[in-house]
């Protein structure tokens, strides 16, 4: 398949999952947005829908979320070198049991050495051949009470590369990078072009916010409404051809 920025140019943009999460017969009609933005209207029409979650979502009824049309989930696992999301293991197993393709993500903390963060991720996220590749969440966190600072572009890239290598070694799968427009512009623009990206863009399509970046996943709202989840949740879409989703789950993003 040939994909553009919304349907990225790559055959490798889809995901290995031995336990196939089912067909796309459960469409996204039951998925909604509390505050929809016209700039991301196209995301609502895309067929491969997903979410990203953490302990903030509380208890999740994964079977209901799956039936409503949730095909994949990015699940917060670790942050820095000493924080494990208290709902990670519950969400990790719940998503798998419901047939939702899932990935574990690590939130990068700029005030801790990368090798300590890598070790923490490896200690808490079990390698799973059925899982999607792990995600490295790379963004500034200027509202943090413990680490609001920005470091240099060079130092940020060094930390990112150390984490990516460690996560790939641990899981056997090349990680996905999550970021937002500001961090991409200041640090990632023109870098790491051989990685899949998951991009935040809640008021416009990604190609309008990111210079020269192809994407695999798009986080298009933080005010999503999904059956099985109380309150609001981030919603995402996969950027490839939805007709290939089941085939893709069986073939790509395999262990190296």
PLM segments and residue spans:
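Bacterial signal peptide processing site
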Residues: 21-24
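Substrate-binding cleft of extracellular glycoside hydrolase catalytic domains
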Residues: 43-63, 75-162, 168-170
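Bacterial N-terminal signal peptides that target proteins for export
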Residues: 2-9
């Amino acid at each position: 398949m040939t994909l553009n920025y919304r349907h990225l140019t790559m055959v490798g943009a889809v995901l290995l999952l031995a336990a196939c999460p089912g067909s796309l017969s459960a469409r996204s009609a039951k998925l909604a947005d509390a505050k929809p933005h016209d700039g991301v209207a196209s995301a609502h029409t895309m067929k491969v829908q997903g979410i990203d979650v953490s302990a903030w979502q509380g208890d999740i009824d994964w079977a209901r979320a799956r039936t409503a049309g949730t095909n994949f989930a990015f699940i917060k696992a670790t942050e820095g070198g000493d924080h494990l999301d208290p709902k990670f293991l519950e969400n990790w197993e719940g998503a798998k049991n419901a047939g939702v393709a899932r990935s574990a993500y690590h939130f990068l903390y700029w005030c801790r050495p990368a090798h300590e963060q890598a070790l923490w991720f490896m200690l808490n996220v079990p390698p799973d051949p059925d899982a999607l590749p792990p995600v490295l969440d790379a963004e500034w966190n200027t509202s943090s009470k413990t680490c609001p600072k920005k470091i240099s572009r060079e130092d940020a890239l060094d930390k990112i590369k150390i984490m990516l290598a460690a996560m790939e070694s641990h899981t056997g799968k090349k990680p996905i990078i999550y970021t937002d427009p500001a961090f991409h512009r200041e640090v990632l623009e023109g870098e790491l072009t051989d990685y899949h990206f998951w991009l935040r863009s809640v008021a416009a399509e990604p190609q309008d916010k990111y210079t020269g970046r192809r994407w695999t996943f798009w986080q298009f709202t933080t005010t999503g409404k999904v059956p099985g989840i109380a309150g609001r949740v981030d919603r995402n879409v996969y950027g490839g051809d939805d007709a290939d989703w089941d085939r893709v789950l069986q073939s790509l993003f395999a262990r190296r």
